[in-house]
């Protein structure tokens, strides 16, 4: 069961992990000129936060006693929406539904690639109604939604890197769903165990920057998962705790421009050093529900 107490950011975090890299070490730029990065036009889906609220606590970031300003959430969300349009991307808008406050976290609704749409099967009953809403939307835009027998929480735990899917498990998505996803998509799936409930979805601890490059926060993963990531992505950007705990890795990249929480300043510097263009946005009101940029953004892969 997830710890629903609000996270503590004091020094006990450092003591908890035997494996720890200091932020100053992690943020050090690599020697040499950065690689040339090329943006690619993307298609996204988003759901306006018209009914956003923290009405229950199903992750450590949610505090039902903390007030939520829906108008601020809507303004921050709209800024993100306009940022994608300004960068040249297209955005499908999904109609929000009253009683489903977490629909704004559209990435969790499914996984779409190669004309195949897998609809989420949520772990918590509070979000079960979203599956029907997203399946209906998928059908309305021409897909035939595919369901899984086991829990999968969409792009919250399923991230595409080139022609490979990185798949998280440990808190939400059932590892047994990974084989189902691989069979449906016809793509290799790499299972990665998450071990810190504050990083309950893969997209809170790992960001895909282009078809060959990722950034991640190692302490969120098991030792075996860290070894897998190190072997698969030896040039990955390793992010420190200061940026991880403001959900800096809950980011969206088009291959050049990386939209990320504005508070993740160290990660932004790392991105610049690696040849990317960080684009900071403030989604602090939506972070109260345990989500940020990527959570609000479902990428529709071609």
Swiss-Prot record:
Pfam families reported in the protein's UniProt record: DDAH_eukar (PF19420)
UniProtKB keywords: Hydrolase
Residues noted as binding substrate in the record, renumbered to the chain: 102, 127, 172
Record: active site: 201 (proton donor), 295 (nucleophile)
PANTHER family: DIMETHYLARGININASE, DIMETHYLARGININE DIMETHYLAMINOHYDROLASE
Similarity remark: Belongs to the DDAH family.
Name of the protein: N(G),N(G)-dimethylarginine dimethylaminohydrolase
Species, as recorded: Mycobacterium tuberculosis (strain ATCC 25618 / H37Rv)
């Amino acid at each position: 069961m997830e710890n629903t107490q609000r996270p503590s950011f004091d020094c006990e975090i450092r003591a908890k992990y035997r494996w720890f890299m200091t932020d100053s070490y992690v943020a050090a730029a690599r020697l040499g000129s950065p690689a040339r990065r090329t943006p690619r036009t993307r298609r996204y889906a988003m759901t306006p936060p018209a009914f956003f609220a923290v009405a229950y606590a199903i992750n450590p970031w949610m505090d039902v006693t903390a007030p939520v300003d829906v108008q601020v959430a809507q303004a921050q969300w709209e800024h993100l929406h306009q940022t994608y349009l300004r960068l040249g991307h297209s955005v499908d808008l999904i109609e929000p539904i009253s009683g489903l406050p977490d629909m704004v976290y559209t990435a969790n609704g499914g996984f779409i690639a190669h004309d195949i749409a897998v609809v989420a099967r949520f772990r918590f009953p509070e979000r079960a109604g979203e599956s029907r809403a997203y399946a209906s939307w998928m059908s309305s835009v021409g897909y035939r939604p595919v369901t899984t027998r086991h829990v999968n929480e969409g792009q919250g735990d399923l991230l595409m890197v080139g022609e490979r899917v990185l798949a998280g498990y440990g808190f939400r998505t059932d590892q047994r769903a990974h084989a189902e996803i691989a069979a449906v998509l016809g793509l290799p799936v790499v299972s990665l165990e998450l071990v810190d409930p504050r990083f309950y979805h893969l997209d809170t601890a790992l960001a895909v920057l282009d078809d060959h490059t990722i950034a991640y926060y190692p302490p969120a993963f098991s030792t075996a998962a860290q070894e897998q990531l190190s072997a698969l992505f030896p040039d990955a950007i390793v992010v420190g705790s200061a940026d991880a705990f403001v959900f800096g890795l809950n980011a969206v990249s088009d291959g050049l421009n990386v939209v990320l929480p504005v508070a993740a300043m160290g990660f932004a510097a790392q991105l610049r050093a690696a040849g990317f263009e960080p684009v900071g946005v403030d989604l602090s009101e939506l972070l109260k529900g345990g989500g940020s940029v990527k959570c609000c953004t479902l990428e529709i892969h071609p």
